[in-house]
């Protein structure tokens, strides 16, 4: 009786087992039995994107180079979306996560390096992984104290460059990247960058794109270095989604 007296059920008011619903539910049960070996199994993602909460807090707390918004979350989302659009399963991980099972790791704006994290990233690339780093990486330790000796800390050899300074753009300002002719990624178009543009000094990295204007026109905006058995890419600016 009451409001649910005509609510759908496996067995209706007729009470028999020769109804369509009963038969279809039975078929579902039989199919689930056949899937017992699959139940509990996992699909290992080949790619991961670093999103670390403590890193986010540290970026939010820093005074400069932009006081309004550093767009850390958006930087993570851009790389996550790019990997998903390639049909890859992607894990979102913190700095405590082991990297050895991945083929690709993107660590955008890894401003804070917990103790030994730079070694973990180096080892990942040395062992054959593809590592994507960006501007504003490896500046402070786990207590938010500046790391000395150059940035990205502990990774300058791996990326083949050292960061020198960073240009904070107003919200209405833009720059753009121009691809090098014959670059191995086959990049042909120009791409807009906003908010943060890092200036780097290349040692032995391959320059794939350069800034198109301002006082740093012609300086690298995208680099690559073969490191160990793997590859390290460094994105020097906050590039638009289409770039990825």
Where are these regions (language model features)?
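Carbohydrate-binding surfaces of carbohydrate-active enzymes
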Residues: 1-244
């Amino acid at each position: 009786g009451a409001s649910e007296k005509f609510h759908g059920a496996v067995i209706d008011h007729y009470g028999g087992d020769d109804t369509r619903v009963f038969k279809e539910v039975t078929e579902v049960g039989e199919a689930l039995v056949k899937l017992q070996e699959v139940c509990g199994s996992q699909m290992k993602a080949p790619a991961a994107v670093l999103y670390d909460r403590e890193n986010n807090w540290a970026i939010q707390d820093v005074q400069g180079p932009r006081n309004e918004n550093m767009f850390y979350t958006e930087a993570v989302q851009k790389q996550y979306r790019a990997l998903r659009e390639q049909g890859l399963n992607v894990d979102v991980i913190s700095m405590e996560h082991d990297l050895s099972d991945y083929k690709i790791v993107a660590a955008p704006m890894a401003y804070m390096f917990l103790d030994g994290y730079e070694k973990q990233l180096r080892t990942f690339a040395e062992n054959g992984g593809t590592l994507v780093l960006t501007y504003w990486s490896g500046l402070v330790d786990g207590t938010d104290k500046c790391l000395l000796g150059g940035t990205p800390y502990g990774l300058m050899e791996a990326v083949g460059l050292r960061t020198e300074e960073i240009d904070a753009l107003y919200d209405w300002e833009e720059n753009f990247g121009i691809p090098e002719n014959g670059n191995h990624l086959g990049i042909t178009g120009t791409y807009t960058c906003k908010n943060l543009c890092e200036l780097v000094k290349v040692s032995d990295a391959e320059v794939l794109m350069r800034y198109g204007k301002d006082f740093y026109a012609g300086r690298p905006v995208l680099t690559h270095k073969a490191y160990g058995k793997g590859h390290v890419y460094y994105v020097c600016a906050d590039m638009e989604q289409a770039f990825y």
